[in-house]
A protein has these predicted regions:
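Long, compositionally biased intrinsically disordered regulatory segments in eukaryotic proteins
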Residues: 1-89
């Protein structure tokens, strides 16, 4: 899996995890507000525009605005599955 696909997978899993916490409508609505990603109706990330690290951080930030530390704790295990995906430059 190439790097962009890994970032899309990580972000899609984050959205899925937030769907459980916030409900699918709210989780997808918040994700669609992130300008550097495109989200399918099913909540999957279909495109990353620009830097994937910035896109990932923007997605995380949009959920942190709502739920704070709970979000950070809930997505931690996702990053264990994708050791090559970085959150910062």
């Amino acid at each position: 899996m190439d790097q962009t696909e890994q970032y899309k997978s990580v972000m899609s899993e984050i959205i899925a995890k937030q769907s459980v916490i916030l409900g699918p409508d709210m989780a997808v609505m918040r994700a669609k507000k992130v300008s550097n990603i495109r989200i399918g109706d099913d909540g999957a990330v279909v495109e990353i525009i620009g830097d994937p690290i910035e896109a990932l951080n923007s997605l995380i930030d949009t959920y942190v605005e709502l739920s704070g530390q709970i979000v950070k704790n809930s997505i931690g295990p996702i990053f264990i599955k994708y050791p090559e995906v970085k959150q910062t430059k």
